[in-house]
């Protein structure tokens, strides 16, 4: 049965594309900074670092494993998907994830990235406007959740009394972001649905191709059986022909030496391989014609010695 590994191939393609994007980003940065570089050296170093990070962090194996689970589910095998679902809902998994998060937090603190910086980076992102010196500050999902839970406060100590502050309608902003999120979610779902349909079509084409191959193999087997039957029939016919010639030879009034010579030639015929048998028959017929020619020459010489003439009618 043919296996569909489209998701694994797509995940591998995304990883390779990410590596190529990393190389392009590195070389573009060096060019903008006016730094001369060797492309092969940059390519080798980025590749070494990229492969090490992807392998050491387990990200590559994690992506390929999830892709393999999706392929198995598309092929009707839901065991791996069920195990992953149970694993994600296990309390031990949750505890281990919390432990990993705590380790990452401590690592960031040891690098000088304190809690304030981590929270701000998690709540906001900055988007540069092309051709402008200003920037757009975007709120993340965490910021939206904090607003909903009432965990956002305004410190008036940083605002002067005479300063006019523009009121931001966070509700409308949130509704706009929610609409954008729903629109993006719909587009992603449409693309995923389209990809699943294409994957199913590819799978159907594979099954159809497999059926065609099976039919061709069956036809080849039938032709092989027919060829084997023809070969057996030829072997039987050749064996019967040799036996018939031997019986006819014994009924002739020829000297025993001639009979023995012809019988030896008949026994040397390969009745197993029809091609060799035809070659042996050709050799036998040539020898008979040659003997007949020699007898005729002897008879012709004898007639001349006796002063006789011969004619063909």
Curated annotation (Swiss-Prot):
Highest taxon of the lineage: Viruses
One of the protein's GO biological processes: regulation of translation
Keywords noted in UniProt: Coiled coil, Host cytoplasm, Host-virus interaction, RNA-binding, Translation regulation
One GO CC term on file: host cell cytoplasm
Region called RNA-binding, residue ranges: 1-149
Compartments, as annotated in UniProt: Host cytoplasm
Coiled coil among keywords: yes
Region (Interaction with host EIF4G1), start-end ranges: 208-313
Dimerization: annotated segments: 150-206
Location of region: Interaction with host ZC3H7B: 170-234
One Pfam family here: Rota_NSP3
Annotated coiled-coil segments of the chain: 166-237
MF-aspect GO terms: RNA binding
UniProt xrefs under InterPro entries: NSP3_N_rotavirus, NSP3_sf, Rotavirus_NSP3
Function, in words: Plays an important role in stimulating the translation of viral mRNAs. These mRNAs are capped but not polyadenylated, instead terminating in a conserved sequence 'GACC' at the 3' that is recognized by NSP3, which competes with host PABPC1 for EIF4G1 binding. The interaction between NSP3 and host EIF4G1 stabilizes the EIF4E-EIF4G1 interaction, thereby facilitating the initiation of capped mRNA translation.
Family: Belongs to the rotavirus NSP3 family.
Subunit structure: Homodimer. Interacts (via the coiled-coil region) with host ZC3H7B (via LD motif). Interacts with host EIF4G1.
Protein name per its UniProtKB record: Non-structural protein 3
